[in-house]
UniProtKB/Swiss-Prot annotation:
Organism in which the protein naturally occurs: Dictyostelium discoideum (Social amoeba)
Gene: mybF
Compositional bias of kind Basic and acidic residues: 82-96, 365-409
This protein's name: Myb-like protein F
Taxonomy, superkingdom: Eukaryota
A Pfam family per the record: Myb_DNA-binding
Chief location bin: nucleus
Biased composition (Low complexity): 23-79, 97-107, 135-173, 193-203, 310-364, 519-556
GO biological process, one term: positive regulation of transcription by RNA polymerase II
Compartment(s) of residence: Nucleus
Disordered as annotated region, ranges: 22-107, 122-203, 310-410, 519-564
GO terms, molecular function: DNA binding; transcription coactivator activity
Domain SANT: from-to ranges: 412-464
Amino acid sequence: MKSMQYHPPTTTLVSEFNKEKYNNSNHYNDNNDNNNNNNNNNNDNNNNDNNNNNNNNNNSIINNESDNESNGTSNNYNDEANDNHHHHQDDEHHGNGNDNDNENYNNQNVNHEKLASIKNKNYNNNESDNESIEEINSNHNNDNNNNTNNNDNSSNNNNNNNNSNNNNNNNSKEINEDKENYNNCDQHHHNHNNNNNNKYNGGSSYNYNSKNCKEYINNLENLLKLSNKENKELYEKIISLGSILNEKKTLLSKYRNVLIDYLEDVHIYDENGNANPNYDNYNNTQQKSIKDFDVGKDLVKSNLNLQFHNYNNKDYNKEYNNNNNGNNNKDYNNNKEYNNINNNNISSNNNNNNNNNNNNNSSNKEYKEKEYKEKEYKEKEFKESKDSSLKRKSSSDDDGDDSGRDTKKYKPGRTVWTLEEEELYKEVFNHYGKNWKKIKTHFPDKSKSQVTSHGQYLIKINKLQDLQKVKSPPTLNITLNDIIEQLKQQQQQQQQQQQQQQQQQQQQQQQQQNNIVINNENTNDNNNHNNNNYNDNNNNSNNNNNFNNSNNNNTNKFIDEDDD
């Protein structure tokens, strides 16, 4: 007898089984008519019971087929129609009970071959059918007896199976072999499963996989929706960030232009504190673009000291000396290696000049000494001229305290003078003249230099007369509050005058409007009168014409009569 080949089901996956239960199970049941797939992962004793049940089910199927054939119905089945009824036993998981299991398996295969041969024939005699069915039933009973023997043997084999259950590596190999068998048989039994599904209206495992596919598709659709939402949000963020970047680029361009304008009058000194004359050839075209522009990269990190054209700075010489002694600073020594690196922002001309300066120290020293001496000479001249202008000449008109005294080097800023203070200043100046000390008593918030400079300014503008100083004048009891009240009164008077003027203007406008109305009425009356006269004249002319016509008619009548 030929042994039936095992065909694994294409609708179930090996990965769905648990490893431990799969290793302990020795029998599979693929019967689609009885939904026993959930019981495939039980112990050996339960699987043997399932085999008994399956054999009984096969007997019931055969009896049903015989009943259908006795009614005159003949069914033709293919050899592959009963592959879903095969029973598989793993001989590798049994120790000493392999012989009994193989006998049961061969007996079952014989029975299934007989079923296939019976179903492929058209029976005309019911008696021969019943005989063959009885033989098959007897064989199934033998199978049941053998299975009971297997139950006894399985209890002995459980001890041997403990080693296989503990070896996880062997189990994983067996599962991989089953997967390979599944992949090899998948294509071969694809059409076979379709035919069986058409006959038996589908199995539970097929429906189970279709549900899983639908759930998987729904999950994918949900993930697509979520990803689309996230993409939209990210796209909106990108747009907003792009607008912010554009705004910042415009601001950077503005700041860059401001810095360029501010750095036009700048001297940059080398590491040794010497000015670089070629850096004055500053060109905007040599600068970086807005993207590569960094405010603190060109000047701050390069440790180049800045000095503006401001000779009024008191600490100029100190800073210059400190720059010459820059090697003593810790920051300089730490950043010496960084300073030796060629900066990309400095032009190639400056790099060449620096190299020439290092090679020709003697010629450069002479040039630098001359330049430094010229700067010192200019600074001295400027300071002397400034000190001489700040010195005050002694005169008999000045007070004793201020005679021959050098004023402080005070740089007056822009002081704010209100209208009230200016009017008070005018009155005080007209009373005291150029006695600045007396004038300052009325302005405690202002300094003496501010008072004098403001008075001289007003004299230049011709808002004040150039009055001389009044000696020992009487004091004025005028304050800002008095002037504020005077100004308020003046403002009130001006407002009253403006109101009166507005009232007069309104009265004039009303009179003009009344005159216009009267003139319009007169013109309307005249026009009406003229129209009436015109109408009367037209009526008179019409009457005259009618009279003339009547006369003409009468004359014509007389003429006609005469002719007759």
